[in-house]
Amino acid sequence: ATGRRVVGPAGAVRIRSDAKWSVPEPELTLFVNPLGAIVGYTVGNDMSSRDIEGENPLYLPQAKVYDGSCSIGPRIAVNIGDDGPRAIEMTITRGGSKMFEGQTSTAQMRRTEEELAEFLFREMSFNDGVFLLTGTGIVPPDDFTLASRDIVSISIEGIGTLENPV
């Protein structure tokens, strides 16, 4: 998503009005400087309209990029280096009740953080640097969809917790 479509901690993420199946996607997020070097880490939530995405692969941009489709925060952690795998946890609450909870680890990533950054910078430049969301390992089950006023909480070990209302 572009910067104007991203919200920070406590900012409201959105579900598309024309979507029937929307889910959050918790992702380790890298901050990469203009030279392609990873200089920081944060938490990301890459919202997805699964029903729109599933209709046709060409609809992926509409399913993933819209106002309020991404949140990033709560901070940029620097100098954490390669401390090994990090636990990632997501909880979704509705009306004070836990509706979904899932866990994974950065150990499940198929490519290294450096490989992802290198691939992004092969044919693109970012004068101010870029936040790179690395992909999700937690997706709620097919019978779950987000609702207005849900609270999405994503924690990554050593970085912090990002919480957003829907």
Residue map of PLM features:
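Short, basic/aromatic beta-hairpin or loop at an interaction surface
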Residues: 103-112, 120-133
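Charged, cofactor-coupling segments
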Residues: 56, 64-76, 142-166
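Short alpha-helix capping/helix-loop boundary micro-motifs
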Residues: 116-121, 137-142
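Conserved metal-binding segment of the jelly-roll/cupin
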Residues: 126-140, 154-157
